[in-house]
Amino acid sequence: NKMQEEIFEKYPIPKEYFKLALPVVFSMVISLVYNMVDTYFIAGTGNTDLVAGVALGSPIFTLMIALGDIFGLGGSSFISRLFGEKRYEDAKRISVFSFYGAIVSGVAVAAVLMIFRSLVLGLLGASEATWEYASQYYTCIALGAPFIIVALTPSNQLRTEGFATASMVGSVLGAVVNIILDPIMIFVLGWGAAGAATATVIGNVCTDIFFVWFLIKKSKNLSVDPRGFHISRSEIGAVFAIGIPASVTNLMQSIGIALTNRALLGFGDDKVAAMGIVMKINMIAALVLVGFAFGGQPLTGYNYGARNRTRLKATLKFAYLLEGGMALVLMAVLGFFAPQMVKIFMSDPSVVENGALMLRLQLAGMLCMGIVLISTCTFQSAGQAMGAFLLSVSRQGVVFAVVLMIALKVAGYHGVLASQAISDFLTAVLAVVLVWRWWKKVDF
């Protein structure tokens, strides 16, 4: 534990922050690339019904990641505070609970999804034409649920021990396996939608195997050994108090996208298509910001647990400045090249024109989004469940829905486009107020 204490207590903060955050940013960008590669190979079949069928199944994937976050982020937030308090044995038990909790919920999800298959497919909007493909993709992903959900626990927890690079290697390994298997299963074996899903599941299995091996061989304070395992109700509560808000954030994102698409339907399909492209480009920027925000979480949690006010303050100051700087750079670069970015995906002039405007309006809220992300992360690290929950529900949920409704009435089409930026601004104001009030109460 000496090495670990050295890193978290002595290292200069910027160096330590980057050491923890860069691998997170990298893993997130890889997962995005691999989503795009998936889309590329599926589109390569030239079968629109198949492409649509797979797209309809993607919310299921988001749902699984959200569930994985309950144990992944909830467990690791608690573990980093315990490490700061030097309670290594307790941290080990929490890691065991999170690992098996994720397996159990994965099996439960698989069962529920299989039992209610036709009901869920209907809710997702599968039509007669797309049903067969959506169903194939859905079935494989549903059966792979335990493997997909479990992967998120070690990938988050290894960072609390300073193993950010190992966490990245595991995620990248899965993505690479998936990218190699995709064309083989979709085209060579001719499995189509089922092939794409199977490749995803096998990629996750490889990630799981690597993580379990690493935890057994290299990790001192995290474990997958179920022997002598016990956990109290208050400890389960501490994991869920942070894990559930984190998971709600993910679900809100899907809801936000769905609300925007529905609001745009009345303005024509080309607008919906343009927004689909803009969301993908915007996602790159958002993931970089999310990675830098969540990457520093083990450092914030550790210093909070260790009751080290000077170092906690320095960490937060650096986090806000770094995030703000990144947001401004992304706004400038993506905003300047907006039309060219949209053209990569579609060359239709009306889509390019609408898309460029949409992208610039989405980017307008980047700085505020950064403030919200760091604040949410600070609350998660400090075990402040309420603050984390309020912020995660607001930005793409409650505040966004209200802003969208009013903006649509007042300003029509342009109102819809500006909604996210307005919502980001309002949530950022809320974030600053909440963090300020919390910081005045921190008693060390």
What is the predicted role of each segment?
Residues 42-62, 128-133, 193-194, 235-242, ...:
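Interfacial/gating helices of multi-pass transporter permease domains
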Residues 141-159, 167-175, 196-211, 290-293, ...:
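Short runs within selected transmembrane alpha-helices of multi-pass transporters and secretion channels
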Residues 1-21, 79-146, 188-244, 300-365, ...:
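Short alpha-helical transmembrane segments in multi-pass integral membrane proteins
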Residues 51-111, 148-167, 261, 275-338, ...:
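Small-residue-rich hydrophobic transmembrane alpha-helices
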